[in-house]
């Protein structure tokens, strides 16, 4: 994609170009829904608009939930003390995502929040099989960007964003026979900023600082 002009075409430095839909790309409210096996449901509601003032806004919220397979068999745990290798009711998955964006002339602001809760039936990290191992991931960010074309050959872009990530899990360590679960919690927050100046050279080449 276009990012290869900055990072090269080497497959080890792959660049994914995500182009967010603008308010003008919507026709009011959009909705979608779906259902599947294992009590699986998902849905999305989106709204976008461009006003006469030039302000554009976008909002989108989505949800996914699944009870998963109630009886998953793992031959590696096929012993009587491990419920004969069957993990019962440990495949639940839930996530929700919220996105909002504003655009006015050369200035844009976007926020995003994502959360996922997942039960893991495979007894990872030497935990007790057929006991609850659940994970909780949260990720969010807010991004403010200013982008302007200067003259015929220069493009200025400046942005600043705030990010956070949270992870937690609950589990029973292996060879533990109590009723109190062990928990892990990880929190991270960071700020980022960048300024880019791009100049077109010889009509078809770009130089970025």
Where are these regions (language model features)?
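Periplasmic-side early beta-strands and strand-to-turn transitions of outer-membrane beta-barrels
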Residues: 5, 25-26, 34, 46-135
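Residues that define the transmembrane beta-barrel architecture of outer-membrane proteins
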Residues: 12, 34, 39-41, 94-96, ...
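Periplasmic plug
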Residues: 1
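N-terminal periplasmic accessory domains that precede
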Residues: 6, 10-34, 41-47
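Hydrophobic core residues within well-ordered beta-strands of beta-rich domains
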Residues: 12, 27, 41-43, 55, ...
